[in-house]
């Protein structure tokens, strides 16, 4: 358990990129939607 410290599962290779690739456009999309709704009012 302690020897497998480096080979658990690659968090910083696939899951980190996937989370950021999905989170950044959704935050930008929600921000643009809220800005458009505030501008229309």
Swiss-Prot record:
The chain crosses the membrane at residues 16-32. SUPFAM superfamilies: Cytochrome b559 subunits (SSF161045). It comes from Euglena gracilis. Its main location: plastid. Its cofactor is heme b. This is Cytochrome b559 subunit beta. GO terms for cellular component: chloroplast thylakoid membrane; photosystem II reaction center. One of its GO terms (biological process) is photosynthetic electron transport chain. This b-type cytochrome is tightly associated with the reaction center of photosystem II (PSII). PSII is a light-driven water:plastoquinone oxidoreductase that uses light energy to abstract electrons from H(2)O, generating O(2) and a proton gradient subsequently used for ATP formation. It consists of a core antenna complex that captures photons, and an electron transfer chain that converts photonic excitation into a charge separation. With its partner (PsbE) binds heme. PSII binds additional chlorophylls, carotenoids and specific lipids. It is found in: Plastid, Chloroplast thylakoid membrane. The keyword ATP-binding does not apply. Keywords: Chloroplast, Electron transport, Heme, Iron, Membrane, Metal-binding, Photosynthesis, Photosystem II, Plastid, Thylakoid, Transmembrane, Transmembrane helix, Transport. Heme binds at residue 20. It is a single-pass membrane protein. GO terms for molecular function: electron transfer activity; heme binding; iron ion binding. Heterodimer of an alpha subunit and a beta subunit. PSII is composed of 1 copy each of membrane proteins PsbA, PsbB, PsbC, PsbD, PsbE, PsbF, PsbH, PsbI, PsbJ, PsbK, PsbL, PsbM, PsbT, PsbY, PsbZ, Psb30/Ycf12, at least 3 peripheral proteins of the oxygen-evolving complex and a large number of cofactors. It forms dimeric complexes. Belongs to the PsbE/PsbF family. The keyword rRNA processing does not apply.
């Amino acid at each position: 358990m302690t020897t497998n410290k480096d080979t658990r599962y690659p968090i910083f290779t696939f899951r980190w990129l996937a989370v950021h690739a999905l989170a950044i456009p959704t935050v930008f999309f929600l921000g643009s939607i809220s800005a458009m709704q505030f501008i229309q009012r």
